[in-house]
Amino acid sequence: MSSARSHVSMQNKYDRVVLLVDMDCFFCQVEEKQHPEYRNRPLAVVQYNPWRGGGIIAVNYAARAKGVTRHMRGDEAKDLCPEIVLCQVPNIREKADTSKYRDAGKEVANVLQRFTQLLERASVDEAYLDITETVNHRMQQMQSGAFALQPQELVNTFAVGYPSIGDYVNKITNRFANPYMDDERYQMSYDQNDLPAVRQSDIRLLIGASVAGEVRAAVKKETGYECSAGIAHNKILAKLAAGMNKPNKQTILPLTETASLFDSLPVGKIKGLGGKFGEVVCETLGIKFMGQVVKFSEVDLQRKFDEKNGTWLFNISRGIDLEAVTPRFYSKSIGCCKKFPGRNNITGLKTLQHWLGELSSEINDRLEKDFIENNRRAKHMVVQYVQDIDGEEVASSRSTALRDYDQESIVRLSLDLIKANTKTFLRPGSESALNNAIKFLGISVGKFETVSSGQNKLQEMFANQAAKKRRVSGDEPGQLPKVEMEKKQKQTDEFKMKSFFANYLQGAKKEDAKADGISANPLAAAAGAPNKNFVEEYKHKLHAAVRTEGTVLTSTPAEFKESFFSQYLKQQKKTGQQGSVTSREDSLDVQELAEELDAIEADNSKDFEEDTEEETELTSDTHMSKPEGQSSDAGQEQDPNTLNDSTGNDLYVETGIVPPTLTEDELKPSTSKRKFDEIESSVSNYKECYVEFAVPNLRTDILPTIKCDQCGANIPDEVKSLQTHRDHHFAQELSRTLRSTEREERTQSRQKISLKPTPPKKSKKTAGSGSSSYSTAPPSNSITKFFRAKPTQEQAPSDPQMNQCPECKAFIKCVDMPEHLDYHVARNLQRELNQQDLRTRTAALNKEKISPVQPKKQSQKKLNSTISASSSGTKTIAQFFSQSN
C-alpha cells in the first residue's frame, strides 16, 4: 500500500478502539425522509438514464428481500417486485445530481463530530471515529466505581465468534476473576510485550460498543437516519465488522477471533486488496483466503512485492493495521464524471467541449460553495478519460496545477491535457471529428490549502465572476444603484436615490454648458441668470428647432426618455414622498419636458411615415431605439446594451459634441464577455454542431447524378451508388411481398378453422408387413401419393381465381398452381431419396455385423445386391420420368 497517511507506532497497535459508522441504505433513507409515505415499502433509487427504467444505485432491505439488487435495471426490479417504489436521482447538467445526499451526509457528520475530534469521513455514508480517549476515560471511571456497563447499552450488539453478546460478556467477567487464565494461549500467538494490551482488549472493545450505541442513538434522534457500526482495534477490522450484521446493528470483532475469521475470508474483502493489487497477490502467492498469507514470512513478502507492501501484507494477515484515523471532516477532493456508453460515445470536438463545460460548471459551483463553507482553495486538477483505441478501452489520467477557477479556464486546461496526451487527437482530414471516441470523462480537483484571514483574492475572484455573469445575462445595469447604496449603509434608500438624481441633473447642466459654448443671449449668459436652468434652455432650443427648421424629432433624448428615472420621479410624486428642493423642481421640469416631447412626436408621426425609404434606413441606423410609445405598440423588447449605445449616439447628435475616435482595440468587445457568450451559445445549440449528426452535402458540380425511375431521387452516377439504391428498392419490394404473403396465410388459416374437420382415415397394412422389417408400406409422403385421387373440396373458396392444393389443402391462385405443385413434387422426391438411402445403409451395416470376416469383393457384391433388392420394391426416379401420362 503506497499512501502518504499517518500511522501509529507498533507498540500501540492493540491500544486503540476504532469505530466505523456505516449508514444503512443511505440514499433510500434520504428519499424516505423526504417522502414519509415510502416508509416500510420496497424502494430503490435509480439513475437518470431512462433505458429500461434506469440503473439502480441503492436498494433498501425490504426490496432486497424480494430479490432486487444493485446494478439491476428498474424494469427488472419491477418484474421481481411489482410494488417497488423507484425514486429518480435529480438531473442537472444532463447528469445525476447527488447534492442532497451529500448534504444529508454532512448533517450526520455534524452529530458524529461531537463525540470525538478524530473523525475521518470515508465517503458520503461512512465515517471512522477513534474513541480511544473516551474508552480510556471510562476505564478509569469503571475502576473507581463511577461508571458501569448497563445491558440496555448493548442492544443489537453482536460479537464475532460468540453465539450472543451475553456469552462474550460472561467470558470477560470470568477473566476479571482470573486475569491470567488465557496467558498460555496468548503466549503462542502474541509477543510477550503485547500481553498486557491483549488481556484488556475485550473489555476495551465492550466499552467501545457502549459508546457506539450512544453514537447511533444520537444520529437516529437528531437526523432520523439509522446506521450500523463496527468496533475493532483498527480501521480495516472495524470496516469488516460493520458489514457483518446489518441493518441497525453493531458488531464487535475481538482480537482473538481475527485468525479464525481470516481462514475463510477472501482476499478481496480486505480494504486495499479488492482491486488489481489483490489479484496480483492471489496469483503470485497462489492463495484464495486471507488466512493463507500467514505462512509467508515478512522477507518472502518483501521479496515478492516491494518492501512497503510486503510489510503491510505481513501485518494485515495478523490483524494489524497501523493507519491512524486522520481528522478529516471535509472531502479531500471535489470531482464529477460521466460515462458515454455505446452510441453515446463522444466522437466530435464540439461534443467534447460541451461536456467539459458541463463538468467544469459543476466543479466551479462546488468550489465556490466549498470556499464559503471551509475557507480553502484547490491547487491541483486531474482529468480522467477512457478512449476507444482499436477496439480496446484505454484509460488515462493527467494532472496539472490549478490557478484559475472559472469555467472557461477549467475547460481550456482539460482540453489541452487531453490533446497533449493523445497521439492523434483529430481524425485525419477533419477539423471536428475525434480520432478516438471517448467513453468516460471526469474532472476532479484537490490538494486544498486553507486561505488565511488576510487573503481575499479568491473571494474577490468569485465576486468578479458573479458580476461578470450578471453582466452577460443583462442584470448588471439594473443593479448599479444597488451597489452604490451598499457602499453607504448609514444613509436611507430615499435619500440616496434623490442624491443620485440631483447629481445626475447637475452633471447634465455642466455638459450642456460646455456643448453650447456661448449662450443664445450673451448678456443673460454673462449675467448668469440664476432662474434659467438647464431644462428651460433645452425646451427653448427644442421649440425653436421645430418651428424654424421643421425637423422631426425621431427619438427622445436619453436624459428625458420615459425610462427608469422619470418613472421613479413620477412614483415619488404619486406617493407624496418629499425630497430636496432642487431634486423636486428638476423632477417636475423633467416630467413636463418629457410630456411635451411625446406630444411633438405624436403630431409629427404622419410626416415621419411619409419620409422616403432611404431616410427611414438612415434614421434606423442613426437611432436604434424607438420612442417608448412606439415600442409598446409594437410589443417588442430591446436589448439594454443596444439601447444604451443608441441613446449615447443621440446625445452626441442633439448636443453637437463630436464623439471621440476609438482605436481598434477599444472598439473590440470585452474578451471575457465574448468568451462567456461563446460558452453560452455552445451550451444552447451544441447539438447542431455534432460531427456524428452531420449530413454530408452532395455536390452535383463534382459528381454527376441521374434520376431514379421509381422514386425520382438524384443518385450519383456510379456503379456502387446505383447498386445500393436499387438494392434499397428491392428490399422495400421484398418487404411488401412478405407482408402480403403473411396476410394471405393468416386469411387461409382463418378459413381452415371455419371448415369442418374431416374424419381420420384408417391405415391399411400390407400383407407382407410382418415378414420383413424393411419391406414396409410406402410412406404417406411417397411419390405414389402424387397419383392418388383426392376427395373433392367440401367448400369452394370465395375467390373464383383460387384453387385448393391437393397436398397441403391451401388455396392457391390458378396462375401460381403449377409452380406450387412442382414444389410438392420436389419435396416428395427429396424425402423418398433420403429414405431409400437410409434403408440401403442400414441393410449394409447389418450384414457386415453378421459376417464380419467376409472377403472384400464378396461383401461388395452383397452390398450391390442389397441395394438392387431394396430398390426393387419402389419406383426409381428414372421410372417416374419415363412413364407416360
Curated annotation (Swiss-Prot):
GO cellular component, one term: nucleus
Pfam family, one: zf_UBZ
Annotated positions binding Zn(2+) 2: C805, C808, H820, H824
Composition bias type Acidic residues, residue spans: 608-618
Biased composition (Basic and acidic residues): 739-748
Location of this chain's protein in the cell: Nucleus
UniProt: a 2'-deoxyribonucleoside 5'-triphosphate binding residues: R70
PROSITE patterns linked: UMUC (PS50173), ZF_UBZ3 (PS51907)
Family in the record: Belongs to the DNA polymerase type-Y family.
Protein name listed in UniProt: DNA polymerase eta
